[in-house]
């Protein structure tokens, strides 16, 4: 009943009280002159997923750059963002996170060239004019509001605003009339639109983090109360949304870097403000950092289970693809003074300079790097969380680091009742060899647009597990909503094996048990699928290939090659007839997809049946 009344109150807030605050006719401020904007040869194309926006030119803040469609200038909560009607809200929001402003602020700081300060003022004034409070799609989502608050904070620090205000009268007026009013509007929105109950996932974390950072920096209304509220929320959610083993409960690997950054940034900003978080907070954050480190292969690639949307909390660079996991290893090494996070191939970067400054940089430089393969040449099992990572890593004189990496997923579907960012991937596995993805999760590609593709990417058949009767292991009720969650159960765990089952096909009369065993001496993985059927069923078993992998099948043996080099030999069960099946999709980054293929078998089963697959990683 609590959620029922929360939804009523939320509806009252978003459709009645918020509407009273709409002022679409708000006074338009004069745009400051910008020599960069006026220069026809000046361009900086900032990546927005598969597209770009030229941040050295005026920006249409409501344009979806992926379709050319524009979202309406109407009451925010009435705008349809869950269809293709106006295009992709996700692309609009990515522009309006304003993270490119931090890059512009850094350009100003490095050379004190006034043209970049002009450009900063121009864009933020333009944004305020185009986004009156509660008008337009950029006031729809609270996570977007809080990402802007965090961006505002770091821009404020980079520009050294208080000093700049005292020496630059125009900038002082800009801060008073544009920037601070925006900060206060964002802080008000953040507090008044909490994501609770079934929505209390990473969105709620962002809301507490953004409000906490704002209250640490600015004299927002009710500052002390807001600070207390936000800090308490962060302390609570870090324990609720992450297991004691440090695994995030949303079951979306790419989101881990996003969520870890919210908690880390809040802790760092709190330290600057003299506000320390508890030992339990820091202990759980360290466990999260340790899982993240174990989850990464020897090239810091992550297993792409669950949703991923290339979202970042803090981006000081020119945008584009960025391995924030590597950056976070540096951050955690410094924050915890823990050299186990300093892999040999991680480097100091601008993001960590913003977080820790010269003191942190000097600490990191003094810290010894972990030897290649050390601490990675071992399995990392998280039975409470349902994640199992098999690793064999060694240095080879000629070819460098060699690694066999397999991630096995026996985890819940996702977090809370809707499991928004989980995929129907029970008992799926992902294989990397020498840091190259070989057998892969299909990825994400989209949320609310291209509905057929959304259904494909989250489906059971798009993962390396057994699909029964062409159905998903859970029922998808919407793009980010699952019903009838399956439950996984770990049956047996040893040093080099795990066996687990799930009940996602109970209505089909089928129980699937999968055993994964790693023979480290032979560098061979054996996967045994056992099906107990109370009635006849049709099953499909795919092994999805990374687009860079080619495959050849001869009888019951498949050989997989990466860039022409033979990497893997698969012994396929002779009871099944495997073929190379085209027509699949792989999405390494949100908004991008490429065609892919899979080793694929289909058969009818009844009663008790077992299939064995042997995966031999070639030396």
Spans of model-derived segments:
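Carbohydrate-active enzyme catalytic cores, enriched for enzymes
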Residues: 251-439, 491-493, 499
């Amino acid at each position: 009943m609590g959620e029922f009344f929360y939804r009523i109150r939320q509806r009252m807030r978003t459709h009645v009280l918020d509407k009273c605050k709409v002022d679409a006719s708000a006074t338009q401020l004069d745009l400051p002159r910008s020599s960069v904007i006026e220069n026809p040869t000046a361009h900086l194309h900032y990546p927005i997923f598969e597209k770009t926006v030229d941040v050295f030119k005026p920006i249409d803040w409501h344009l979806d750059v992926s379709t050319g469609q524009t979202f309406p200038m109407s009451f925010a909560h009435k705008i349809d963002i869950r269809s293709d009607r106006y295009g992709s809200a996700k692309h609009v929001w990515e522009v309006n996170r304003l993270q490119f402003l931090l890059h512009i602020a850094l350009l100003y700081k490095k050379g004190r060239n006034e043209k970049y300060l002009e450009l900063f003022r121009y864009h933020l004034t333009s944004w305020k004019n185009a986004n009156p409070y509660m008008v337009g799609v950029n006031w729809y989502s609270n996570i977007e509001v809080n990402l802007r608050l965090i961006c505002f904070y770091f821009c404020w620090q980079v520009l050294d605003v208080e000093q700049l205000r005292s020496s630059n009268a125009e900038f002082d007026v800009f801060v008073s009339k544009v920037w601070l009013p925006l900060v206060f509007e964002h802080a008000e929105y953040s507090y008044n639109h909490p994501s609770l109950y079934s929505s209390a996932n990473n969105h709620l974390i962002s809301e507490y983090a953004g409000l906490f950072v704002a209250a640490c920096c600015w004299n927002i209304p009710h500052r002390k109360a807001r600070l207390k509220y936000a800090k308490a929320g962060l302390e609570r959610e870090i324990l609720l949304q992450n297991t004691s083993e440090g695994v995030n409960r949303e079951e979306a690997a790419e989101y881990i870097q996003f969520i870890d950054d919210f908690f880390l940034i809040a802790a760092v900003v709190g330290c600057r403000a003299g506000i320390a978080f508890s030992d339990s907070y820091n202990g759980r954050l360290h466990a999260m950092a340790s899982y993240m480190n174990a989850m990464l292969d020897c090239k810091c690639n992550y297993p792409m289970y669950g949703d991923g949307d290339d979202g970042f909390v803090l981006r000081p660079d020119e945008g584009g693809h960025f391995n924030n996991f590597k950056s976070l290893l540096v951050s955690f090494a410094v924050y915890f003074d823990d050299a186990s996070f300093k892999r040999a191939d991680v480097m100091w970067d601008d993001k960590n300079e913003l977080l820790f400054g010269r003191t942190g940089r000097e600490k990191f430089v003094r810290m010894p790097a972990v030897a290649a393969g050390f601490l990675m040449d071992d399995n990392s099992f998280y039975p409470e969380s349902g994640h199992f990572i098999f690793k064999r890593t060694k240095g080879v004189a000629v070819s460098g680091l060699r690694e066999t990496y397999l991630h096995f997923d026996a985890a819940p579907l996702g977090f809370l009742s809707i499991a928004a960012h989980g995929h129907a991937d029970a008992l799926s596995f992902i294989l990397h060899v020498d840091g190259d993805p070989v057998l892969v999760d299909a990825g994400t590609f989209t949320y609310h647009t291209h509905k057929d593709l959304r259904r494909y990417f989250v489906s059971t058949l798009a993962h390396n597990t057994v699909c029964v009767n062409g159905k998903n292991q859970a029922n998808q009720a919407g793009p980010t909503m699952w019903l009838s969650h399956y439950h996984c159960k770990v049956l047996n765990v040893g040093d080099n094996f795990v066996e687990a089952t799930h009940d996602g096909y109970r209505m089909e009369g089928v129980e699937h048990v999968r055993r994964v065993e790693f023979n480290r001496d032979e560098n061979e993985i054996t996967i045994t699928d056992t099906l107990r059927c109370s009635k006849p069923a049709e099953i499909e078993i795919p092994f999805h290939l990374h687009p860079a992998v080619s495959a050849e099948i001869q009888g019951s043996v498949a050989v997989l090659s990466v860039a022409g080099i033979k990497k893997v030999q698969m012994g396929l069960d002779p009871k099944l007839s495997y073929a190379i099946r085209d027509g699949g999709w792989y999405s390494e980054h949100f908004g991008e997809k490429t065609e892919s293929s899979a080793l694929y078998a289909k058969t009818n089963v009844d009663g008790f049946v077992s299939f064995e697959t042997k995966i031999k990683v070639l030396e």
